[in-house]
Amino acid sequence: MSLNSFKRALWLYHINAGSCNGCDIEILAVLTPRYDVERFGIVLVGSPRHADILAVTGPVPRQMVSRLKRVYEQIPAPKVVLQVGSCGMEGGVFHESYNLVGPVDQIIPVDVYVPGCPPRPEAIIEAVVKAWVKLEKAAEQRIT
């Protein structure tokens, strides 16, 4: 199995569940010429219906629960969810907020965690590669 066996570009959809935007800036940094992940076929898309990977930043407030579930359901199978940043795992700076429901993995299943506040772009790229491998394994299981 190689990363070349995925026949098209890997499409990533990003949703901010309520972060401070630090993680969002690092996701955008991955797309800049310094890292240029598009040369490897990793593309940010504007619709969850086109995505292979869902990248979620921030903790989940009450207002985002139904939207996050709806976005997750719109992504076609096989799909992988990345939790980017410490806020979505434990609350981070928003830990004691009255409006938080909890970490992302209590709302939707998370496959790959990217810790950090904010995580480095290299860590995000490494997580996307792990997600890519999981997608390939899921695609192989569907074929066989």
Locations of regions flagged by a protein language model:
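Iron-sulfur-associated redox domains of electron-transfer enzymes in respiratory
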Residues: 1-144
